[in-house]
């Protein structure tokens, strides 16, 4: 699934190519990607036709395009979604689901939503130009200037759950997915199962700093692409996968100590870590169940 760096690369591309464009026509080629829009495919298309795109914004893994009437086109890429800016005469992609014909952007372009697995989707958010209410509950991401480091540290240290699980909690911190959680934990030398309440404030701040570092590095390389499913708006893949230290490197030598990287199952996915640099936490001692009998 695309994470913060990949989604930010797409947002930046949309900002370059579609700002100021008017949506002249909307073709919904499959109803599933617009299933979250209660208007249905025809109502979705009608709500967008004639509207001008004012900006391109993101919160976590969600994208939205504010429109000139105060509404917004809200999108999530899911597992395999792509937002492509194409010339009108470009051949249709195999999994093209929604097409927006644009006027006034790069001498006429199309914004295409392509999604093989169709876990992603588009919808029109009424009054959602500033922040769609559908995603208002999602926390800010670590690259957001208004992200509250102190609050994040306090909340992590109040919880007994493993720190990787917390990094993936979009209500606590958004945009961090499996890849960058593993990479940040490797850089910080912290095991993902270490409970938050067993980390010092300094260690949590170090982990947050590493999360920012790895995401900024990924942004600089266009994101991480393991296959053709993640591309930017021009159809180009990122290459940060060449710079990964832990994720996807099971059995390969840790670049710090030489120990083989280990993979374990985690929340219907996989975690990758170095068992030496990131030692597993000791189990908590069970509370005594003995009952004292009075003399």
Swiss-Prot record:
Q: Which SUPFAM superfamilies match?
A: Glucocorticoid receptor-like (DNA-binding domain), N-terminal domain of MutM-like DNA repair proteins, S13-like H2TH domain
Q: What's the name of the protein?
A: Formamidopyrimidine-DNA glycosylase
Q: Which UniProt keywords apply?
A: DNA damage, DNA repair, DNA-binding, Glycosidase, Hydrolase, Lyase, Metal-binding, Multifunctional enzyme, Zinc, Zinc-finger
Reaction(s) this enzyme catalyzes, per UniProt: Hydrolysis of DNA containing ring-opened 7-methylguanine residues, releasing 2,6-diamino-4-hydroxy-5-(N-methyl)formamidopyrimidine; 2'-deoxyribonucleotide-(2'-deoxyribose 5'-phosphate)-2'-deoxyribonucleotide-DNA = a 3'-end 2'-deoxyribonucleotide-(2,3-dehydro-2,3-deoxyribose 5'-phosphate)-DNA + a 5'-end 5'-phospho-2'-deoxyribonucleoside-DNA + H(+)
Per the record, the zinc finger regions (FPG-type) lie at: 245-279
Which free-text remark accompanies the cofactor?
Answer: Binds 1 zinc ion per subunit.
Q: What is this protein's gene name?
A: mutM
Q: Which domain of life is it from?
A: Bacteria
Could you give the subunit structure recorded for this chain?
Answer: Monomer.
- Which Gene Ontology molecular-function terms are recorded? 8-oxo-7,8-dihydroguanine DNA N-glycosylase activity; class I DNA-(apurinic or apyrimidinic site) endonuclease activity; damaged DNA binding; zinc ion binding
